[in-house]
A protein has these predicted regions:
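Alpha-helical transmembrane segments and their membrane-interface boundaries
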Residues: 1-122, 130-157
Length: 157
């Protein structure tokens, strides 16, 4: 009969503290300097941007930032095409082929600019096409780019 190995509870290391500090500083920055803005996406950017070391942090932060930028601009363009056909917005079947086209273009652009941008770019693209309305799709996209940029910068400090 084998004896079970004792499981060691993971410790709180410097990377753990740095991640928590980055997210917390983002929230504090928004509350103090940008009180009308929601800090959630900046905090998410800070957490996603943190890696095991500086090289990994740049990679993860770049994935998140470039994905948000590519998906944001692509989503704005495709949603604008949608609004030409359906000016009132809403959910129409046209969104399905636009999503297909968008994902294909997203992957091509990610291969050109930043390979890891596909997943975060896809999230922003889907949100813009299916969850954000015609009145605020541009501001939503630009806000996500700004907030993600703030979070990624905080994770690299």
């Amino acid at each position: 009969m084998e004896t079970a190995e004792k499981r060691r509870f993971p410790g709180v290391g410097l990377r753990n503290i740095k991640t928590a500090c980055s997210a917390t500083l983002c929230a504090l920055l928004y509350f103090l300097l940008l009180p009308d803005r929601n800090p959630a996406f900046a905090c998410i950017g800070a957490i996603f941007g943190m890696g095991a070391n500086m090289e990994h942090s740049k990679l993860h932060g770049g994935n998140r930032l470039f994905g948000t930028i590519i998906g944001g601009f692509l989503g704005m363009g495709l949603y604008r095409v949608f609004l030409i056909v359906y000016p009132e917005g809403g959910h129409h079947l046209l969104l399905v082929p636009l999503l297909f086209i968008g994902v294909v273009i997203l992957i091509i652009l990610a291969q050109i600019f930043w390979v890891g941008a596909v997943q975060p770019g896809g999230v922003v693209l889907c949100l813009l096409l299916f969850s954000i309305g015609p009145d605020n799709y541009i501001s939503y996209s630009l806000n996500r780019m700004f907030d993600t940029g703030v979070g990624v910068v905080m994770s690299l400090l």
